[in-house]
Amino acid sequence: MTDTILNVATFPGDGIGPDVIESAIQVIKKASIKVDNLNINWDYIEAGASYYQKTGMDVEPDGEKKASEADAIFLGAIGLPTVRKKDGTEIAPHLRFREKFNLYAGVRPVKAYRNTPQRLSDKNAEKIDFVVLRECTEGLFYTAAVHNRNKIANNDEVEDIMRITRNTTTRLHNFAFKLAEKRKQKGKLGKVTCVDKANVFKSQALFRKIFNEIKDDFPNIEADTCYVDAMALNLVRQPWEYDVMVMENIFGDILSDLGGGLVGGMGMASCGEIGDNHGLFQPAHGSAPDIMGKNKANPLATILSGSMMLEYLADKKNCPQANEAALIIENAIEEGFNKNLLRPFEFGGDMSTTEITSQILDLIK
């Protein structure tokens, strides 16, 4: 069999970004050695707040072109709270990437692992395993500052727009049901919940209408709906009852962080932003400049994002060995928590970034 070479545009970024992305790359390299004919070329690209301070640009010249030509994009963390543009907003080229590469499907897995902090006392909390599927190119983020689309924006009034289109929403809901089908094959619930505010906003009513039109195309998947305020309650009361939850941009932004809190913290929050032709993968947490350079960051969100990237590449490039490598990584993390061998500082543990990385490398079989 000819070796498969995958090209990944790699943005280490700011703060803890370079540290956690190097941890993930080490783990992916080790897993790749364990499977046949899988090679990954990591094309490093400068971007972010630190780069902006030096150059006045948020991405190096040709950086976006390199990203567009890569098989996938892997990002550490971008932005520093002390570095802002003249309009007061942070440096966030990754928000621009969402639109440029049409990354409409934001996949945010939430899974409970043994020996991690459980915020809920109910014994069912150990069963938490759901995905927040967040639309990433429109919704209320349509007028995010990076896009400069506000029609009214002055010192007395600012008007933002929640934009929902049939084209994007149809693709998103189809993505949700297909994701639920894949998860059902792995023993998950096989259920999609549309989370919206259809009783108040016309845009949200359209979001739900399209969901109801599509659900009959997937008779093997259970479909239901829930208002977003009720879902905030349900995620605290019974999050184990959910599988795939599909929602507008700002709702997903908020509820995915709530989900991260349920299973320990944002150090476990992986993220994939996927379109029809491109995929960007990154931890959902920020750059955490307060622990930058202290070897305290939890690299697991980035490692899990890297595993998700491998699954994406397996489908995109018809590369089953990438799926094998992803499974190796996931099994190593599962085993590590089951044996209490992974104890991040974030959870009150005693293991540094490098120690967690080394432990996972040892667990890869």
Regions found by a protein language model. Give the residues of each.
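Extreme N-terminal starter segment of soluble prokaryotic enzymes
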Residues: D3-V8
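Glycine-rich phosphate/diphosphate-binding loop of Rossmann-like nucleotide-binding domains
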Residues: A9-Q26, K30-V35, I152-V228
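Buried hydrophobic positions in well-ordered alpha/beta secondary-structure cores of metabolic enzymes
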Residues: D14-G17, D71, L133, A176, ...
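Flexible, glycine/charged-enriched surface loops at secondary-structure junctions
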Residues: D36-W42, K184-V195, F218-C226, K316-I328, ...
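N-terminal beta-loop-helix "entrance" segment that forms/cooperates
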Residues: N37-P61, L235
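Glycine-rich phosphate/nucleotide-binding loop
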Residues: A49-Y51, V107, N234-N340
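N-terminal glycine-rich phosphate/adenylate-binding segment common to multiple enzyme folds
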Residues: Y52-E159, I250
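Short acidic loop-to-helix transition motifs that present clustered carboxylates
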Residues: N115, C226-L233
